[in-house]
């Protein structure tokens, strides 16, 4: 079943610290020569690069075995692999084939102009859409021929998978304008499936029908790719956000509420991946991070990989959250080649920390957590086997004027890793964390602090429990800022104490700072 990573997928132990190029950034060798070195300089280890069917097969090629690769144009593919190899970058190719953002505008001209051979999907009113019908065998065979040729060429160009480590099949598959295809071929399949009798006739039932149909189509490409050149394969999804109904967003793609239909229809796909642009980053991640479950026979349901996310000043802390909370396979802001230095700075800083943690084999730990805070969602409490950790946004501390002057808070975030009893690493930006025993936490005082970190005014304290504290307390034994070398060894940089720990009350990383802190605790 889907979700069981193939042998090649299981070898993706290094995190994908990625960035996706804008749609037209790899349409010439000159662009490729210019953009890939810039991606390396930003700290990426992987670039997601479109592979354009319309440029690869401008003239329709024969499907005969003898000529199947002779006249495909792989110039851009070859240049991407060559430059990436020189820059020590990995590549994930994005197959812009029959569908890109639902539509079929990356198909070659000969495909677009022959709607008789390659029919379009239709609305219930009979309106043709710029969406090729997934029920047409001609559509499938043309797509399959080109994608198979691409996979064979990649196998010849990069046989050991040193550069190309994964493939995306199509891009944000889904229906728009209509929840399902009503073309004659689609109606025939709909009746043969007895779909209305099984699921009803509303738009949500229509979406399920299309999800299974799209998945079955993709399975043909995935199965062929697996036989030609075995590597991880995934499909990505545009989210169903803002209360939109099927047909108002790219419906029937690999969305969280349709995962079972995609599992059934496309068992050769390794990952279903969310493209996250709207608010609610943590919620979207949770829907796609599906851990081991007994009913899956101990197999991973779906591992989180984010191939597209809005590239912004908050991208870095979001990456740390995804790796810390969900042991993500990778993170990739979209159109990073067009982003401003202000937007890419957080990505570079976060990837520097993540690369160090990877050196120390500290990613994908079972005992790790992710934090992501903003002005409304500003605190999380975790009980780690008797160690109660309260992590907050840095601006919950009163002495930074931006905390109270009406400024919009940038997101703060981090990942916390348990190394052992009373031993943690905190990596991130814009967070503060304290540690208490459960008894201590239950009886902690609630107080309003002034800018000096003490009670704002005398008597401004309320105590939850006035009984005498029983049991032990936790204190900070040491807080060291560290780096992690290429060989995985931890390198001491400086000791945080005094004002930097509020006299032993907490560990913190300021807004705009990017650090790894090694925190040790003790009981007293």
What residue spans do the PLM features occupy?
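C-terminal beta-sandwich/jelly-roll accessory domains of carbohydrate-active enzymes
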Residues: 401-408, 425-524
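Polysaccharide-binding and catalytic clefts of secreted carbohydrate-active enzymes
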Residues: 107, 112-259
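Short, acidic/polar
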Residues: 25-41, 247-265, 281-285, 316-319
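Catalytic-core region of carbohydrate-active enzymes that cleave or remodel glycosidic bonds
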Residues: 89, 220-227, 257-364
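N-terminal carbohydrate-binding accessory modules
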Residues: 3-46
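The substrate-binding groove and active-site-proximal loops of carbohydrate-active enzymes
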Residues: 16-28, 53-75, 124-145, 153, ...
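Aromatic- and carboxylate-lined catalytic core of secreted/periplasmic carbohydrate-active enzymes
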Residues: 317-442, 453
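Aromatic-lined substrate-binding rim segments of carbohydrate-active enzymes
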Residues: 32-116, 214-230
């Amino acid at each position: 079943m889907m979700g069981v990573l193939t042998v090649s997928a299981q070898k993706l132990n290094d995190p994908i610290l990625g960035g996706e190029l804008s749609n037209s950034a790899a349409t010439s060798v000159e662009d490729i020569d210019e953009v890939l070195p810039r991606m390396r300089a930003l700290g990426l280890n992987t670039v997601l690069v479109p592979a354009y069917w319309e440029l690869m097969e401008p003239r329709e090629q024969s499907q005969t075995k003898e000529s199947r690769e002779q006249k495909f144009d792989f110039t851009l593919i070859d240049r991407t692999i060559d430059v990436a190899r020189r820059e020590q970058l990995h590549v994930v190719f994005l197959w812009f084939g029959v569908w890109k953002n639902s539509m079929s505008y990356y198909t070659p001209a000969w495909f677009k102009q022959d709607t008789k051979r390659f029919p379009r999907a239709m609305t219930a009113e009979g309106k043709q859409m710029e969406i090729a019908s997934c029920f047409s065998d001609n559509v499938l065979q043309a797509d399959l021929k080109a994608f198979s040729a691409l996979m064979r060429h990649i196998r010849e160009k990069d046989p050991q998978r040193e550069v190309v480590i994964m493939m995306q099949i199509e891009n944000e598959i889904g229906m728009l304008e209509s929840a399902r295809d009503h073309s004659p071929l689609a109606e025939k399949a709909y009746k043969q499936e007895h779909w209305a009798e099984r699921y009803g006739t509303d738009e949500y039932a229509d979406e399920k029908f299309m999800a299974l149909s799209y998945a079955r189509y993709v399975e043909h490409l995935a199965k062929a790719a697996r036989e030609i050149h075995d590597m991880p394969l995934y499909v990505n999804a545009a989210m169903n956000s803002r209360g939109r109904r099927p047909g108002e967003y790219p419906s029937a793609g690999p969305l969280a509420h349709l995962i079972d239909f995609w599992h059934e229809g496309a068992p050769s796909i390794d990952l279903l991946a969310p493209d996250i642009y709207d608010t609610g980053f943590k919620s979207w991640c949770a829907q796609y991070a599906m851990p081991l479950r007994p009913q899956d026979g101990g197999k991973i349901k779906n591992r989180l990989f984010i191939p597209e996310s809005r590239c912004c000043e908050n991208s870095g802390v979001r990456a740390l959250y995804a790796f810390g909370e969900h042991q993500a396979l990778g993170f990739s802001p979209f159109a990073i080649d067009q982003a401003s230095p202000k937007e890419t700075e957080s990505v570079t800083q976060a990837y520097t920390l993540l690369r160090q943690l990877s050196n120390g084999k500290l990613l994908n730990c079972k005992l790790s957590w992710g934090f992501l805070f903003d002005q409304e969602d500003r605190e999380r409490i975790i009980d780690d086997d008797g160690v109660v950790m309260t992590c907050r946004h840095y601006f919950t501390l009163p002495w930074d004027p931006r905390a109270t002057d009406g400024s919009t808070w940038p997101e703060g975030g981090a990942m916390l890793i348990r190394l052992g009893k009373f031993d943690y690493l905190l990596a991130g930006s814009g967070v503060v964390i304290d540690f208490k025993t459960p008894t201590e936490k239950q009886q902690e005082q609630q107080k309003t602090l002034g800018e000096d970190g003490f009670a704002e005014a005398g008597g401004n304290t309320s105590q939850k429990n006035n009984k005498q504290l029983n049991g032990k307390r936790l204190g900070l034994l040491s807080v060291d800022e560290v780096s992690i070398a290429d060989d995985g060894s931890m390198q001491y940089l400086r000791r945080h104490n005094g004002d930097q720990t509020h006299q032993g009350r907490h560990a913190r990383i300021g807004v705009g700072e990017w650090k790894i802190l090694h925190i040790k605790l003790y009981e007293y």
